[in-house]
Regions:
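Short acidic/histidine-rich active-site segments
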Residues: 4-8, 24-30, 46-66
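Distinct, well-ordered alpha-helical segments
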Residues: 35-42
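Active-site microenvironment of metallo-dependent hydrolases
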Residues: 60-79, 83-194
Length: 194
């Protein structure tokens, strides 16, 4: 792989960036590792392979704290320069995902952007979508189109009717033992373990 958002420690991030991998520092509702990852790579001179991401944020978290703008604020709090933090969440992340028309203000790029009055607080004063002003000072200006996505559409997944026994797990038993994969929780960091 050439990208990883599973680094939990400064050492892991440093090793991966030294190997030329893209490293994502994530701040989700349950995993917060921006500070740890940043502390491992902050002495690099070249940050094009460093990205900021959320991975998963709950709706309540987004409502009260924001989304990627909140992750950028966290990176700045931990010592990252504001412009480098913004670039890590926009252009670097777009490049990582192979989205060549996102992440910058340039001809041929999608004109989705926001304006802020303070590079450290990152509270949007104006929001543009497809080149049009859609929100200003916290007020929605654009009309919202009602869209319908019927579940019975032609491209839907068709599943037979399920019963309780369909959810019973029948693991392979070897010498009276079963191998189980677990998710372990380490102080705001999830880790997969065997």
């Amino acid at each position: 792989p050439n990208t990883c958002h599973e680094s939990r420690t400064a050492e892991e991030a440093l090793e991966k960036m030294r190997s030329g991998m893209r490293v994502d520092a994530r701040d989700s509702s349950i995993t917060k590792n921006v500070e740890a990852i940043w502390s491992g790579v902050k002495d690099f001179r070249f940050f094009d392979n460093f990205c900021l991401c959320t991975d998963d944020r709950e709706a309540d978290d987004i409502l009260h704290n924001g989304h990627i703008n909140d992750v950028v604020r966290a990176a700045i709090r931990y010592g990252m320069e504001p412009v480098a933090a913004i670039k890590s969440a926009t252009l670097n992340s777009a490049r990582e995902a192979g989205l060549q028309n996102l992440g910058a203000v340039a001809p041929g790029y999608a004109a989705d952007m926001l304006l802020v009055d303070d590079l450290r607080e990152l509270r949007p004063s104006h929001v543009f979508y497809a080149g049009k002003l859609v929100a200003q000072e916290g007020r929605l200006l654009a009309e919202i189109e009602d869209k319908s996505y019927p579940l019975e559409s032609a491209n839907s997944v068709h599943v037979r009717k399920l019963a309780a026994e369909d959810f019973t797990i029948h693991p392979p038993v070897s010498q009276g033992k079963v191998k189980v994969n677990l998710m372990k929780y380490y102080d705001m960091n999830l880790s997969t373990t065997d």
